[in-house]
């Protein structure tokens, strides 16, 4: 058994320990791990002129041991970091101040200031607890416990953490520049015509442009133009503002989004459907657009019809370059963007001799039918009540109080207490008549329609509806020579009863005959006679009834012939019994 060599000198021992530590440090660097610079040694320091294995094993055991005691001879003497090994230091990771219980050694001092950088590196976490010195009652003196070597980052991890921190700082600066940009300077932009112009993005320039557009676009000095350019709403009556626009730029479509402009109020909308709704609700925009179209026609310019391929290719509906929109210039009727409807409607209005101007009901004029009828009745009652009051006052009854209109509940409850009809009629107050306006108007319109019904010349078909007659002609009597709506209208107008000279009773007879022959009536279906048993039973019943009737007639004739017969007692024989029926 080998004994540890006797200690000869402390200087020689310290030199050998430093050499051994340098060897271990080099091995640790090669293996990718760092060794703690202030690990105490538990074994006794001794010198060996042969191998020095005792110092090596003792230092290794001290590093791996959890209960190594710091010797008193080492308490006042610490080795510098340059003597052990050089450790790269990262300034952002080490704070300027630290808490007293935290051991401020460079490999372990990763404080809360570096929490933003640690999670970004794999294997480098901030949840490793800092080193706190612990004391034990069993060992005398001060004791230190080294942290585990697995949590200590190596040089490559520290360099990677520094690179990630620098990249995150650059990204954060870029985000701050995006969120809080500097004021933009006027830049030159190239328009669609190839002319350079400078546009200012400042708020003052934007306000000035908005004020100029409001002053130039408005057709009159009236500020009630319900348009997005003058109000904060994107469409009339809606709460969505229009998109910001450049008034000089008419190229509003890009590859990503679709933007359309109303040429009347210069309001930009995100889609054609929203522009359609705006033009349909805003009457002034329709008038301005229709006026532009009529002015173009008067000047000899032939603008494309809305909805056609030429209009779509020229950008009439999309950008409004030529002032076109889905509004019919003949009848001022709003049309959808569907090109089939627009083409058919405009062709019909152009061919018609007198295009009808339809009265457009505004929002404040719209009323439900119930409210309209109730309002008319109230006005009629009030008018008659005022007339009766004026007549009663002119008749000399100045002191008679005004009587309120009667109610149905009052009549139902106190009908027995009222005066007689004669006395009631002689008084100044008279009951109000029941209104019959609706029935009279309805009957008058019905009679007018019946007097001018459509009568087919080829058959007995009669109808009061134009669509029914048109469908009847297309189905039963196709006429391919009629290709335009105008020819169809002329044909249908010629089939009216007034033009054919049929009216009065003759027209009523035709209508009644058509109703009787119509398939719409509830006629009973004819029974099918395919079943032979049912037909035979019906024939047998008919024969039996005929034979029974003949037998009864013969008996009646025989009884009448025996009327003078008597047996001396003036007693007539009883009639024969009736025949037995099967």
Curated annotation (Swiss-Prot):
Gene Ontology biological-process annotations: cell differentiation
Q: Where is the composition biased (Basic and acidic residues)?
A: 352-368
Q: Does the keyword Transmembrane helix apply?
A: no
User: Which residues form the C2H2-type zinc fingers?
Assistant: 454-477
Report biased composition (Polar residues) as residue ranges: 188-226
Q: Name one Pfam family in it.
A: zf-H2C2_5
- Subcellular localization(s) per the UniProt record: Nucleus
Q: Where is the composition biased (Low complexity)?
A: 227-244, 551-570
Q: Tell me where on the tree of life, at the top rank, the source sits.
A: Eukaryota
Region annotation Disordered: residue ranges?
179-251, 352-377, 513-582
Which UniProt keywords are given for this protein, alphabetically ordered? Differentiation, DNA-binding, Metal-binding, Nucleus, Transcription, Transcription regulation, Zinc, Zinc-finger
Say what the protein does. DNA-binding protein which binds to the promoters of let-60, lin-14 and lin-28, possibly to regulate genes involved in hypodermal and vulval development. Together with miRNAs mir-84 and let-7 may direct terminal differentiation of the seam cells, exit from the molting cycle, and vulva formation. Does not regulate the expression of mir-84. May promote hypodermal differentiation in association with swsn-9, a component of SWI/SNF chromatin remodeling complexes.
Q: What is this protein called?
A: Zinc finger protein somi-1
The gene name reads somi-1
């Amino acid at each position: 058994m080998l004994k540890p060599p006797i200690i000869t000198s402390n200087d020689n021992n310290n030199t050998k320990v430093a050499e051994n530590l340098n060897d271990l440090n080099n091995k640790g660097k090669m293996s990718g791990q760092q060794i703690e610079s202030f690990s105490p040694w538990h074994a006794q320091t001794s010198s060996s002129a042969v191998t020095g294995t005792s110092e090596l094993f003792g230092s290794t055991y001290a590093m791996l041991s959890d209960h190594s005691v710091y010797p008193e001879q080492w308490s006042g003497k610490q080795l510098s970091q340059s003597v052990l090994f050089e450790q790269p230091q990262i300034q952002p990771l080490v704070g300027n101040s630290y808490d007293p219980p935290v051991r401020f050694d460079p490999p372990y001092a990763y404080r809360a200031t570096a929490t933003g950088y640690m999670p970004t590196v794999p294997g480098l976490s901030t949840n490793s607890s800092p080193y706190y010195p612990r004391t034990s009652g069993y060992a005398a003196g001060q004791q230190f416990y080294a942290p585990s070597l697995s949590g200590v980052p190596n040089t490559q991890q520290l360099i990677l953490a520094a690179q990630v921190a620098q990249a995150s700082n650059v990204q954060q600066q870029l985000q701050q520049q995006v969120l809080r940009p500097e004021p933009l300077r006027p830049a030159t932009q190239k328009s669609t015509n190839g002319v350079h112009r400078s546009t200012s993005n400042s708020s003052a320039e934007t306000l000035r442009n908005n004020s100029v557009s409001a002053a130039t676009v408005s057709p009159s000095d009236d500020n009630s133009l319900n348009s997005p350019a003058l109000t904060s709403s994107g469409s009339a009556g809606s709460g969505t503002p229009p998109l910001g626009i450049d008034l000089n730029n008419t190229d509003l479509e890009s590859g990503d989004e679709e933007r359309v402009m109303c040429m009347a109020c210069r309001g930009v909308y995100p889609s054609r459907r929203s522009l359609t709704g705006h033009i349909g609700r805003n009457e002034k925009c329709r008038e301005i657009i229709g006026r532009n179209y009529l002015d173009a026609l008067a000047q000899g310019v032939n603008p494309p019809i809305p909805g056609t391929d030429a209009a779509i290719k020229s950008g009439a509906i999309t950008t409004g370059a030529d002032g076109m929109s889905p509004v019919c210039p003949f009848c001022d009727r709003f049309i959808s963007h569907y090109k089939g409807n627009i083409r058919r409607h405009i062709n019909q209005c152009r061919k018609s001799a007198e295009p009808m101007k339809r009265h457009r009901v505004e929002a404040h004029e719209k009323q439900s039918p119930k409210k309209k009828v109730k309002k008319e009745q109230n006005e009629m009652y009030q008018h008659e009540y005022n007339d009766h009051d004026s007549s009663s006052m002119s008749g000399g009854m100045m002191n008679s109080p005004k009587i309120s209109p009667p109610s149905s509940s009052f009549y139902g409850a106190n009908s027995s207490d009222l005066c007689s009809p004669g006395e009631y009629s002689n008084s100044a107050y008279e009951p109000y008549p029941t209104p019959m306006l609706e029935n009279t108007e309805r009957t008058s319109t019905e009679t007018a329609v019946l007097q001018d019904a459509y009568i087919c010349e080829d058959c007995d078909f009669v109808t009061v509806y134009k669509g029914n007659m048109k469908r009847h002609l297309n189905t039963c009597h196709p006429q391919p020579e009629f290709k335009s709506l105008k020819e169809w209208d002329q044909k249908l107008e010629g089939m009216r009863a007034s033009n054919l000279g049929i009216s009065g009773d003759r027209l009523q007879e035709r209508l009644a005959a058509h109703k009787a022959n119509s398939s719409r009536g509830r006629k009973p279906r004819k029974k099918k006679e395919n079943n032979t048993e049912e037909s035979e039973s019906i024939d047998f019943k008919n024969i039996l009834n005929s034979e029974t009737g003949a037998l009864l007639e013969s008996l009646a004739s025989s009884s009448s012939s025996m009327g003078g017969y008597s047996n001396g007692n003036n007693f007539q024989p009883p009639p024969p019994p009736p025949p037995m029926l099967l």
